[in-house]
Amino acid sequence: MLETGRVSKRFLTIALGSLVVGAMSGASRDLRAQSPGPAALSGVVSSQQEGNMEGVVVNARRDGANFTVSVVSDAQGKYSFPRTHLEPGKYGLTIRAVGYDLSGPGSVEITAAKTASADLKLDKTNNLAAQLSSLEWAMSISGTPEQKDKLIYQTVSCAYCHTLERVMRSKHTADEFVALITRMQTYYTDGSAVSTDQRGRGQKGMPDQVAAAEQNPIWGREPLGVPKKELAEYLATVNLSGGRTTWPFELKTLPRPKGNATRVIITQYDMPRADTVSHDLDPDSTGTLWYTDESRMFFGKMDPKTGAFTEYSLPSVPPGDLPGARDIQVDRDDNIWFPRRIAGAGIVLTRFNPKTEEVSTIEGVGTQFMALGPEGKIWAGWTRVDPKTMKVEATYGWEKSPNIPPGPHRQYVDLTVVNSKGNPYAPDIGGSYIIGIDAMTGQAKFWQVPTPRSSPRRGRMDAQDRFWFAEYTGDKIGMFDTRTEKFQEWPMLRKYTTPYAVSAPDRNGYVYATSNMSERLIRLDPKTGAIVEYQIPTEFDSKKIAYDPTTSRLTLWMVNTRTARMMKVEPLD
């Protein structure tokens, strides 16, 4: 059934100061700047312990602005912000370098006339625990490999919603942890993301989820599901329970970025609502970024030229029902598609026309993930839709296939990608297979990922019909060539990286992956296997990577789900 209507709109012009004013007068600089250009601010980062320091993330935020620009110091300790990225004004400066704090508050005045200079002195930190990523906690904590695997190698682990620091700083006993683990199971995971800077929010699940949590003695899923009591007893040995004021293990850290990993500019824009939990984004042909909220009934856009956000409200759902939407897909006509939740835990496929602001829905097409296929077809899970007529053309499935391999099998929540022949493929996160369906015959086929129990997750199909995907518990990036039916895998630099989402290759052939455990964006050169890890300036969790279609220099966009920010990454090499 096709329904149409309209949504109400809220314009949210965020505090960008002169940038927004300039945009209104037609004089604003494009925040998608095409070339770094001359420096607005430069300096040297050093410490008494190391001298000039490489790999220190330096952050600059103008007073009153809603965005922060970050660069990384080079091998000589030098950092530089291009003038294209910093307007004149007073800026606060902060750093990220594990083991160090900035000596005193950092600030600088930037003018249009000359390059400002600010040398930064760092001191050894007195609170190393507050600086550790979840991966560094995993490296540090005591326990057997089996205990750590059961804690971390879960498709929805503690670090899916917050960092492991929260667990390690707790003082819960084993008995208290059992009740706490049960309470955590009552939250809707994709609608919950809580950062240490008080952004994001927790979202309770549906009543049936809450009831199931009370009855379930297990935390996690097979094959690594663990009895809550067993996990609770382990966690009570590594937190601050029993009157401990420090941890019974050495805190270990990752090396800071070096070489190519320092050649990047990262800009993060605060979303209007600090409690937004945005799962996905997609750019349209003009570069405008569209996003959804996983736990609120609205969707929005950000204009990268001005940094201004606009929100569009959606019909509410009854109390007790889950609100929000997950994936979002822009079609070839710049219409916006997303799965919207409705009363009774239902989902309807929704199309928004930005020109007319008309909303159309297709009932009976419910899924969580979207894809764009050949000829511009919209895919909602295994269902193919003609975007012009909004008619369902076909719906496929694999569950009744006669050739299903021995289980268990669990497709990753209706995620599909589509090759040039119009055939859909999906990761089987439970069985570690790639599932493909011939769109002409409806026949399903299964290919086992070379690494067992690798939990294949989100990815993209490229123009050569290669499906690039994350191996979440395999700590690898995988590629399945749908033409040759061959796999290739590339390992991450270290265990417990747990890559979540993988991009298609960029114009230089590089592939990117997100890691909420390491709080780094990973770049892979598939030809050599070389990996570059870009340090994200804040906590980091992103579910999808998109390329900007309008910039001459490579630009990646992501939603930082953990901190409710839109994030732009510009590799400089």
Language-model features, listed with the residues they occupy:
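Structural motif
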Residues: 44-53, 86
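A short, solvent-exposed loop/turn motif at the edges and junctions
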Residues: 63-66, 88-107
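Short, acidic Ser/Thr/Gly-rich low-complexity loop/linker segments typical of extracellular
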Residues: 63-80
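Extracellular beta-sheet/turn segments enriched in Thr/Pro/Gly and aliphatic residues
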Residues: 109-134
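The canonical Cys-X-X-Cys-His
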Residues: 154-165
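Beta-rich, blade/repeat-based domains predominating
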Residues: 274-286, 318-333, 364-375, 402-421, ...
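Conserved beta-strand positions in repeat-built beta-propeller and related beta-rich domains
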Residues: 289-295, 331, 336-344, 372-374, ...
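Blade-level signature of beta-propeller repeat domains, shared across WD40, Kelch, NHL, RCC1
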Residues: 536-573
